[in-house]
From Swiss-Prot:
It holds the Pfam family Put_Phosphatase. Keywords: Hydrolase, Magnesium, Metal-binding, Pyridoxal phosphate. It comes from Rattus norvegicus. Phosphatase that has high activity toward pyridoxal 5'-phosphate (PLP). Also active at much lower level toward pyrophosphate, phosphoethanolamine (PEA), phosphocholine (PCho), phospho-l-tyrosine, fructose-6-phosphate, p-nitrophenyl phosphate, and h-glycerophosphate. This is Pyridoxal phosphate phosphatase PHOSPHO2. Its cofactor is Mg(2+).
Length: 241
């Protein structure tokens, strides 16, 4: 049986936030104050819809967005990690669950030739309309009260595991690699054999620290990382167990 690796994208695979990164395409590399102030908590996808409309209205073309997105730096050690996983696909299945969008993730993976490492990508579907505006739709609908309305990563992960079970695919354990607040929900549902891998110093790490101080039990083990090389070391340890 294989190990399932679940990756976040922004600030995990890449070392920045792809949505805020493309603001460099705007005039003076910033958004108008009224657009900045239009964000409402839990409605990030809707906010980005307004940002993409603004960029289109300002004459920013698809090629400019692509050039910006494909210049995003990978997180330290991540290229080595993805290369390691490519060489060990017989041991690992890899999926991405991200609140970015399908176009940005496709561009990054395609430019770095890492598409083949990932079995499935779950994210907000995106496309360019006839006017050249990038439109992003919600990933799904869900009933979770802890997550933004467009994406509950725990729901997505649970549905993926169920579908794999229906195909007769079982995993020895799940390793969840992420950084953000929306990674807390799926991580708290991991089981005893599983591993939560929060990026050091980021929201997920800080939240799990607080939970342990408040004696809120976590079933899974927690392994903090700051470089993909540390993740490789832990995966090598797991497959030798």
């Amino acid at each position: 049986m294989k190990v399932l690796l679940v990756f976040d994208f922004d600030n995990t695979i890449i070392d920045d936030n792809s949505d805020t990164w493309i603001i460099q395409c705007a005039p003076d590399k910033k958004l108008p104050i009224e657009l900045q102030d239009s964000y409402q908590k839990g409605l990030w996808t809707e906010f980005m819809g307004r940002v993409f409309k603004y960029l289109r209205d300002e004459g920013v073309k698809e090629e400019e967005l692509k050039r910006a997105v494909t210049s995003l730096p990978f997180t330290s050690g991540m290229i080595e990690l993805l290369s390691f996983l490519r060489m060990n696909k017989d041991r690992f299945d890899c999926i991405i669950i991200s609140d970015s969008n399908s176009i940005f993730i496709d561009w990054v993976l395609e430019a770095a030739a890492f598409h083949d490492v990932f079995d499935t990508v779950f994210t907000n579907p995106a496309s360019f309309d006839s006017t050249g505006r990038l439109t992003v739709r919600n990933c799904h609908t869900h009933a979770c009260t802890r997550c933004p309305k467009n994406l509950c990563k725990n729901t997505v992960l649970g549905e993926f595991i169920d579908k794999q079970l229906q195909k007769g695919v079982r995993y020895t354990r799940i390793v969840y690699i992420g950084d953000g607040g929306n990674d807390v929900c799926p991580v708290t549902f991991l089981k005893k054999n599983d591993v939560a891998m929060p990026r050091e110093g980021y929201t997920l790490h800080r939240t799990l620290d607080k939970m342990s101080q408040n004696l809120e039990p976590m079933a899974s083990s927690i392994v903090v990382w700051s470089s993909g090389m540390e993740i490789i070391s832990h995966l090598q340890f797991l497959i030798q167990m």
